[in-house]
A protein has these predicted regions:
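Conserved alpha-helical substructure of the radical SAM core
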Residues: 2-137
């Protein structure tokens, strides 16, 4: 019988009941693009009839992102995780590498990552993402 080891990183974790109320959030999910270039049957983002009434498909402006990073800087302690995706495909935002670079340069965010379908990675474009300052890029192959 094989013993499986958890892939969760448990080192440095806090028991929330001992640290509440929090002085700042541990993590924030931002959506640089609330649209997607795929229409996966299992994902609500690809179903126009499901999402029409719930959210507007759009691309976040760089100035809006700058404002958010500025506000994150006002927290009394650094943010542990910034996830640069939620509903949409983040690479649809052409400013994504620069956004990640700005977040990294703020020195107020410990870990930055995003998940992507990878369809927009090619040539020099992928170099921009690899040099952006992201700790991890998750490519979802569905």
């Amino acid at each position: 019988m094989a013993i499986e080891k958890s892939k969760l990183r448990l080192d440095g974790r806090h028991n929330l009941e001992k640290v509440l109320p929090l002085a700042a959030p541990y993590s924030i999910y931002l959506d640089p693009a609330s649209a997607c270039n795929f229409k996966c049957s299992f994902c609500p983002t690809g179903h126009q009839e499901l999402v029409t009434g719930f959210y507007k498909r759009s691309i976040m402006s760089f100035s809006m992102f700058e404002n958010i990073i500025s506000q994150i800087g006002m927290f009394p302690c650094p943010l542990k995780v910034l996830r640069m995706n939620k509903i949409g495909e983040p690479t649809l935002n052409s400013c994504l590498p620069e956004m990640i670079g700005l977040a990294r340069a703020s020195e107020r965010i410990e870990w930055i990552d995003f998940a992507t379908n990878g369809s927009r990675f090619s040539g020099d474009n992928i170099e921009r993402f690899l040099r952006s300052g992201a700790n991890r890029i998750n490519i979802s192959l569905e």
